[in-house]
């Protein structure tokens, strides 16, 4: 045995010598070398670059991370053995200097990160060996000067970060070696002056960030940006710019984003943005602009986003955005605007995001055009919610323009500056012959002012081909709406022969309709405002005076009766012009009347009300869709005026539907969903056709099948458990008579009786058989067959036991 053990020992020794263990790589202290190509030493508290001499193959390392340590100096031999290195990270250290030969062996390096250190300069020639370098981060240092030799040899550089330094100027041709540079970050420095040749040889540059510097107040020299023909993003925000000269960006034909935010601009030359035909986004927020030249934005045909927030704009010309057909986003928030023309955004059909919040809006008749435009754009789903919160007058302070009625915007002292064409308001020249003395009556001097001498209150507009016949009967309260019959061209106060005889040149007369919506009171009813009739004037002052007196008397008597009626509020239904108020107070009782397999009829009620004349009567929009469908209400239909019922066709049988109705006033709908006017219905099953799937029956069948499967599984598990229980009892349990024999619950007497009865034939002089071998300590000899399994059962087993007993106890 000892010889065999010795042989085994020598065999093991020989095997170990023949197959030595594989040598493991030795990683530098405090570093991680789990991946053979990545050497990770980030945030390890290192104060010097670890030695890589212990690495078995340093040439395999491609990434070396040393960021977040306390390294202060880089020697010439720290990376001497890492010739295949592609990425070197030295950020967030305390490096103050770089040895001129630090990167001499790193000719394959592509990414170098030196950001957030204490470097004060990039010595000429230090980076020259890095011919394949594409990304260089030198941000967050203390670099105060640059020279052309700082970037010598970096022909492949694509991205350069120099932000967060203390650069005061850019020397001429400092970036000339970087012919392939695409991204240049110079923000957060102290640059005050841009040299004429600062960006020479940067013809491929796409991104230039000069924000947060100290540029001179005036940017006037266009030659600075001449080399940047491919520039698409220019950021000049957070400087001290105050003026922009004309055509300063004319050499940037591909510029798509220009940011001038956060400066102190107070003046922009009308041609400041000339040549920027490709500009898509212009940011001018946070300046001190109080006006915009009319032709400032004219060259920007491709403009899509314009931010003018945070300035001091108090007014905008209606044609300011007349050339921005692609404008999609416009911000005018936090300015000093009090009114805007309704036509100012008419040339921008793509506008969908408009921010007008934070201005001092004066909600009067000057905002009616803007309100109509907003309503039309909202109803067409082409504009997001615009918040125009009133600041003046005090009675409307804090309210939003789109929820105000036109009656609240009426001001007796304001003139509608430029009616919006979207509302159908056009100015029509009306010819008259002043030679015949046919001027408007004295009582209507305020209602019908001549165009050369506009009066403060212009209160009516006449359509072409309108005669004055019957106008006095249609003048209603202070609304001053002249319902005139269209009979001929112009105001026919005289016969054609008289007009021909006069021979005087006609004058143009502009009338502006200023309807006041709401219930008039006695205070605002005009008391002395005559109405012209169809009777021809005689042309003499006496005839004209008598005509005026008669008209005044008739009008005064009619208005006195109307004033009593208006004050008592009898017989005048409410005037509703807002679709939300119409849905809330006028529309009611939406019910489903008849339902079939493919159609359904709904009916609703409309309370008595009045609608503004320019808007016409109320129309209705019926929305319906299957219940639970997402998105909701993909189908809807517009109904004509005075409709109170509708029938939906082409519905699906045995399907639940949700039907809603809402009012449409002046082409506008309420932006709030009509939840109060909705009803549900379930169409009937299709008769005579192949019925669809009965989902209720299908559900019950599936539930029954699932319950049956559960019961079968429980039954199988129960039977298996019971079978295991019985099998365990058979294997581990003793015969029943043995358990009863040794039971402690049986009395001692009965147990002794049983023993004496069973072994009554015992004879001590007989020899023990080999069948039951007992030890010398046994006091009683038990028959072994009593411990045998009695499960053999049957008559044969009992007979064999009895025969054995007879043979043993024969004597």
Swiss-Prot record:
Signal peptide: 1-25
Gene Ontology cellular component list: extracellular matrix; extracellular space; lipopolysaccharide receptor complex
Keywords, comma-separated and alphabetical: Glycoprotein, Immunity, Inflammatory response, Innate immunity, Leucine-rich repeat, Membrane, Phosphoprotein, Repeat, Signal, Transmembrane, Transmembrane helix
Protein name: TLR4 interactor with leucine rich repeats
Biased composition (Basic and acidic residues): 510-519
Gene for this chain: Tril
Modifications after synthesis and translation: N-glycolysaled.
Upper taxonomic lineage: Eukaryota, Metazoa, Chordata, Craniata, Vertebrata
Bias (Low complexity) ranges: 440-460, 494-508
């Amino acid at each position: 045995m000892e010889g065999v053990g010795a042989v085994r020992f020598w065999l093991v020794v020989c095997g170990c010598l023949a197959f030595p263990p594989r040598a493991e790589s030795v990683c530098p202290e405090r570093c991680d070398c789990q991946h053979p190509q990545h050497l990770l030493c980030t945030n390890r508290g290192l104060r010097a670059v670890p030695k890589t001499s212990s690495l078995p193959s340093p040439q395999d390392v491609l990434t070396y991370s040393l960021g977040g340590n306390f390294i202060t100096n880089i020697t010439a031999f720290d990376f001497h053995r890492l010739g295949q290195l592609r990425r070197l990270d030295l950020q967030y250290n305390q490096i103050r200097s770089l040895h001129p030969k630090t990167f001499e062996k790193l000719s394959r390096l592509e990414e170098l990160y030196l950001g957030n250190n204490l470097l004060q300069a990039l010595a000429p020639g230090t980076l020259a060996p890095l011919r394949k370098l594409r990304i260089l981060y030198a941000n967050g240092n203390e670099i105060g000067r640059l020279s052309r030799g700082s970037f010598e040899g970096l022909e492949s550089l694509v991205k350069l970060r120099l932000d967060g330094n203390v650069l005061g100027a850019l020397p001429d041709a400092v970036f000339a070696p970087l012919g392939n540079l695409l991204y240049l970050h110079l923000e957060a420095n102290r640059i005050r002056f841009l040299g004429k040749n600062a960006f020479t040889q940067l013809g491929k540059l796409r991104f230039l960030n000069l924000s947060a510097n100290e540029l001179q107040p005036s940017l006037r020299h266009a030659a600075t940006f001449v080399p940047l023909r491919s520039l698409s993003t220019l950021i000049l925000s957070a400087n001290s710019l105050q003026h922009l000269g004309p055509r300063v960006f004319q050499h940037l034909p591909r510029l798509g984003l220009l940011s001038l935010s956060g400066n102190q601009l107070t003046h922009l030359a009308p041609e400041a943005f000339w040549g920027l035909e490709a500009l898509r986004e212009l940011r001018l927020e946070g300046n001190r602009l109080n006006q915009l030249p009319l032709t400032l934005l004219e060259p920007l045909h491709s403009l899509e986003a314009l931010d003018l927030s945070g300035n001091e704009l108090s007014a905008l010309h209606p044609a300011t955005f007349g050339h921005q057909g692609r404008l999609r986003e416009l911000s005018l928030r936090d300015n000093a605007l009090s009114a805007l023309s309704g036509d100012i955004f008419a040339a921008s059909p793509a506008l969908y995001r408009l921010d007008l919040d934070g201005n001092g809006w004066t909600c009067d008749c000057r905002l009616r055009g803007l309100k109509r435009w907003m309503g039309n754009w909202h109803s067409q789903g082409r504009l997001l919610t615009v918040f125009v919160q009133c600041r003046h007058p005090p009675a409307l302070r804090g309210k939003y323009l789109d929820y105000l009625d036109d009656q609240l915007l009426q001001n007796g002292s304001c003139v509608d500056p430029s009616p919006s064409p979207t509302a159908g308001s056009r100015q029509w020249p009306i010819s008259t012959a002043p030679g015949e003395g046919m001027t408007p009556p004295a009582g209507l001097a305020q209602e019908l002012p001549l165009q050369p001498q506009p009066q403060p209150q212009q209160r009516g507009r006449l359509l072409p081909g309108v005669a004055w016949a019957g106008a006095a009967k249609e003048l209603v309260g202070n609304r001053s709406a002249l319902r005139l019959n269209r009979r001929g061209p112009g105001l026919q106060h005289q016969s054609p022969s008289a007009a021909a005889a006069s021979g005087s040149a006609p004058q143009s007369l502009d009338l502006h309709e200023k309807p006041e919506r709401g219930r008039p009171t006695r205070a605002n009813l005009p008391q002395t405002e005559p109405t012209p009739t169809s009777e021809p004037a005689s042309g003499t002052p006496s005839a004209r005076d008598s005509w005026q007196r008669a008209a005044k008397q008739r009008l005064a008597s009619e208005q006195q009766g109307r004033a009593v009626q208006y004050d008592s509020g009898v017989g005048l239904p409410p005037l509703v012009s807002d679709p939300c108020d119409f849905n809330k107070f006028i529309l009611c009782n939406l019910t489903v009347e008849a339902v079939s397999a493919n159609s359904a009829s709904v009916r609703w009620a409309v309370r008595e009300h009045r609608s503004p004349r320019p808007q016409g009567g109320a129309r209705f929009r019926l929305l319906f869709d299957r219940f639970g469908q997402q998105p909701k209400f993909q189908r809807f239909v517009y109904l004509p005026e005075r409709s109170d019922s509708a029938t939906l066709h082409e519905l699906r049988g045995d399907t639940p539907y949700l039907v809603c109705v809402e009012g449409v006033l002046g082409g506008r709908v309420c932006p709030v969903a009509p939840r109060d006017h909705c009803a549900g219905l379930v169409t009937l099953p299709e008769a005579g056709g192949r019925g669809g799937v009965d989902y209720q029956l299908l559900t019950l069948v599936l539930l029954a099948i699932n319950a049956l499967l559960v019961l079968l599984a429980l039954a199988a598990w129960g039977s298996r458990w019971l079978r295991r229980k019985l099998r365990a009892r058979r294997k581990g349990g003793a015969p029943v008579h043995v358990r009863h024999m040794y039971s402690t619950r049986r009395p001692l007497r009965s147990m002794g009786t049983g023993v004496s009865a069973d072994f009554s034939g015992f004879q001590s002089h007989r020899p023990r058989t080999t069948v039951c071998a007992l030890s010398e300590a046994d006091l009683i000899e038990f028959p072994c067959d009593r411990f045998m399994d009695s499960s053999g059962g049957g008559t044969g087993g009992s007979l064999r036991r009895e025969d054995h007993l007879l043979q043993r106890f024969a004597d």
